Amino acid sequence: MVSDAEIKRINELVKKSREEGLTEEEKLEQKALRQKYIDAVKLSLRANLDSIRYVEDLEENKPKQ
């Protein structure tokens, strides 16, 4: 999970890169933070997709009356 502080830092680096540019160290930090954020989003999306149940599957498993 990406913390609020890390998201804030990502946004600070984006703003700074647009206004004045980043040092090599800041570019590496930005790249690492972005990758961590992307990985967290992918993990969350995968968990949501894995929890989806199809209605047809549920209806087939019901006992017939």
UniProtKB/Swiss-Prot annotation:
One of its GO terms (cellular component) is cytoplasm. Disulfide bonds: none annotated. Pfam families: DUF896. It comes from Brevibacillus brevis (strain 47 / JCM 6285 / NBRC 100599). HAMAP family: UPF0291. Belongs to the UPF0291 family. This is UPF0291 protein BBR47_33060. InterPro entries: DUF896 (IPR009242). Keywords: Cytoplasm. It is found in: Cytoplasm.
